Regions:
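Class II aminoacyl-tRNA synthetase catalytic cores and aaRS-like
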Residues: 1-280
Length: 280
């Protein structure tokens, strides 16, 4: 047994020895038995350390929130009265045979973990969140947002490819072009006194693609603009779905492509009701 499994898989592996790795979400000492809620990218599972596993128990006594742990143990069913209906893995627990501390954690500047019974997250100022970004990214809300963004990207890719678009990543180091804001300039080491410009938009490149025989192009473009912060974008860089179509007679063809995409993104990812007549 050498392969690591995820917390959510434990419910299907009753009676088997498993290896888990993740963060200590919380630790409780109940009458000499130590319970640790182990968290990984799939969720939580309770691991139980008994005093007869002397080495593991000694280590478990010193475990604190956000310690990174390696657990080897046996999955067993919980007694009916101990089942936690608020937890996906609440019908099982892992009885620890071997416990390893992969990394310790200093006292936390804010709470990272959120228990299954408490869905509320601590209200933390943005300046603190950005200073400890690696901790902020562990919070359930941030994990959810990152996964939803990845799902949205996958949805858009599938939609664009179904409509015969080709995804092309265009260059980041380019020459300056007339756009609506100032360029970010990067000195060229090989050409003293010369500069690259970070693209405000991939306009020149997508026009080259149209001429070059790629009539339907798209990408998730990173755009760089030296302009004041706006309500819909941060200073410096932002991301957009960029696309171009050749051989189009009028705007109606573009609307027939974009309207269904906007409709589905709004309803499926923003959770808002929208109909075609709502789209201007």
């Amino acid at each position: 047994m050498s392969k690591r499994i995820l917390a959510k898989q434990t419910a299907e592996l009753i009676g088997q020895e498993v290896k888990l790795m993740g963060w200590a979400n919380s630790r409780r000492d109940h009458g000499g038995v130590i319970f640790i809620d182990l968290r990984d990218e799939s969720g939580l599972v309770q691991v139980t350390v008994h005093p007869d596993s002397k080495e593991a128990f000694k280590l478990a006594e010193g475990v604190r929130d956000e310690y990174v742990l390696k657990v080897i143990g046996k999955v067993i069913e919980r007694e009916e009265k101990l089942i936690n209906p608020n937890l996906e893995t609440g019908t099982v627990e892992v009885v620890v045979e071997t416990l390893g501390i992969l990394n310790k954690s200093e006292p936390l500047p804010f709470a990272v973990s959120v228990g299954p019974e408490n869905k509320e997250e601590q209200n933390v100022g943005e300046d603190v969140r950005l200073k400890y970004r690696y901790l902020d990214l562990r919070r359930p809300k941030m994990q959810h947002m990152l996964k939803r963004r990845a799902e949205m990207y996958a949805f858009i890719r599938k939609y664009m490819e179904a409509n015969d678009f080709t995804e092309v990543a265009t260059p980041i180091l380019a020459n300056s072009s007339p756009e609506g804001a100032r360029d970010f300039l990067i000195p060229s080491r090989f050409n003293p006194g010369k500069f690259f410009a970070l693209p405000q938009a991939p306009q020149q490149f997508k026009q080259l693609l149209m001429v070059g025989g790629v009539p339907r192009y798209y990408q998730f473009a990173t755009c760089f603009r030296d302009e004041d912060t706006r309500a819909d974008r941060l200073y410096g860089d932002f991301y957009q779905l960029d696309l171009e179509m050749a051989f189009v007679d009028d705007g109606e063809e573009v609307r027939e492509l974009i309207d269904p995409l906007v409709l589905r993104l709004t309803t499926e990812f923003a959770g808002k009701k929208l109909t075609f007549k709502d789209i201007p």
